[in-house]
């Protein structure tokens, strides 16, 4: 990735960075919650974004 990015690319990367985090613990603690983990986590080496 180049150091000179367009704003569109930068915004896209920022969104992906925010999405790539575990679910909050309080969501797991909710009664009847079936969500155990964030199934859409992405590892920087294994799966690329396709830019």
Swiss-Prot record:
What is stated as this protein's family in its record?
Belongs to the eukaryotic ribosomal protein eL39 family.
Please report the name of this protein according to its UniProt entry: Ribosomal protein eL39-like 2
* Disulfide bonds listed in the record: none
Where is the protein found, in the record's own terms? Cytoplasm
Q: Which GO terms describe its molecular function?
A: structural constituent of ribosome
- Note the coiled coil stretches, chain numbering: none
Write down the PANTHER family for this protein, in alphabetical order.
Answer: RIBOSOMAL PROTEIN EL39-LIKE 2, RIBOSOMAL PROTEIN L39E
Task: Give the multimer and partner information.
Answer: Component of a male germ cell-specific 60S large ribosomal subunit (LSU), which contains RPL10L and RPL39L, instead of RPL10 and RPL39 paralogs. The composition of the rest of the complex is similar to classical ribosomes.
GO CC terms: cytosolic large ribosomal subunit
Keywords assigned by UniProt?
Answer: Cytoplasm, Ribonucleoprotein, Ribosomal protein
Main location class: cytoplasm
Tell me, what does this protein do in biology?
Male germ cell-specific component of the ribosome, which is required for the formation of sperm and male fertility. Replaces the RPL39 paralog in the ribosome of male germ cells. The ribosome is a large ribonucleoprotein complex responsible for the synthesis of proteins in the cell. The male germ cell-specific ribosome displays a ribosomal polypeptide exit tunnel of distinct size and charge states compared with the classical ribosome. It is responsible for regulating the biosynthesis and folding of a subset of male germ-cell-specific proteins that are essential for the formation of sperm.
Entry's InterPro entries?
Ribosomal_eL39, Ribosomal_eL39_CS, Ribosomal_eL39_dom_sf
Which example biological process does GO assign this protein?
A: spermatogenesis
Where is it expressed, tissue-wise? Answer: Testis specific.
């Amino acid at each position: 990735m180049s150091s000179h990015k367009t704003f569109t690319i930068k915004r896209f990367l920022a969104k992906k960075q925010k999405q790539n985090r575990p679910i909050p613990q309080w969501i797991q603690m909710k009664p009847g919650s079936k969500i155990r983990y964030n199934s859409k986590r992405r590892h920087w080496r294994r799966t690329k974004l396709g830019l």
